[in-house]
Amino acid sequence: MDPKLLDILVCPVTKTPLQLDKAQQELISTAANLAFPVRDGIPIMLEEEARTLTAEEKERFMKQKRG
């Protein structure tokens, strides 16, 4: 995914920044507790297409966010 695109995309639910999970090809919103799929390099930013993060996933991404 283009890093410039990631810089301007925000969560459609909370309007907060997203994190890219390269392994799962998802954009992560820890604020909304959602993972949005990236299909063929195209982010699918629809709430109904997103999946809910598990508690473990959310904690992992929160730690990554803090550095």
Swiss-Prot record:
GO terms for cellular component: cytosol. InterPro entries: Trm112-like (IPR005651). Belongs to the UPF0434 family. It comes from Hydrogenovibrio crunogenus (strain DSM 25203 / XCL-2). It comes from the Bacteria. HAMAP family: UPF0434. Pfam families: Trm112p (PF03966). Gene3D superfamilies: 2.20.25.10. This is UPF0434 protein Tcr_0959. The lineage of its organism: Bacteria, Pseudomonadati, Pseudomonadota, Gammaproteobacteria, Thiotrichales.
